[in-house]
Amino acid sequence: MKDEIIREVYDTLVDRKNNPIDSYTSKLMQDSDKKAEDKILEKLGEEATEVILASKNNEDLVHESADLIFFTILNLAYKGIPLDDVFDELISRHN
């Protein structure tokens, strides 16, 4: 199913944090703790702004939303927060 990509991305990012390879996301998460966190938060802010700016064009909105979701998942993986915690929160809000 299409929604499985969220877990696949999360699992890949956790693996890249624990077993760094030569990739942008691995390097981002392997920086010194404070520097890595600051860079991830900066990227999240940038992507959130881009989603807002792209909201008048559906194609741009889809692209920028994917970026924001990716970096949100990256932040969760970096902080060691299980994806199921987010799913549980969404379920509790839906009920």
Curated annotation (Swiss-Prot):
Location in the cell: Cytoplasm
Enzymatic class: hydrolase
Pathway assigned in UniProt: Amino-acid biosynthesis; L-histidine biosynthesis; L-histidine from 5-phospho-alpha-D-ribose 1-diphosphate: step 2/9
GO BP annotations listed: L-histidine biosynthetic process
E.C. number: 3.6.1.31
Keywords in alphabetical order: Amino-acid biosynthesis, ATP-binding, Cytoplasm, Histidine biosynthesis, Hydrolase, Nucleotide-binding
InterPro entries reported for this sequence: HisE (IPR008179), PRib-ATP_PPHydrolase-like (IPR021130)
Molecular function terms from GO: ATP binding; phosphoribosyl-ATP diphosphatase activity
UniProt key word Secreted: no
Gene Ontology cellular-component annotations: cytoplasm
Tree of life domain: Archaea
Coiled-coil parts of chain: none
Reactions accelerated catalytically: 1-(5-phospho-beta-D-ribosyl)-ATP + H2O = 1-(5-phospho-beta-D-ribosyl)-5'-AMP + diphosphate + H(+)
Pfam families: PRA-PH
Family under the similarity heading: Belongs to the PRA-PH family.
Matching HAMAP family: HisE
Name of the protein described by the UniProt record: Phosphoribosyl-ATP pyrophosphatase
Organism: Methanosphaera stadtmanae (strain ATCC 43021 / DSM 3091 / JCM 11832 / MCB-3)
Encoding gene, per UniProt annotation: hisE
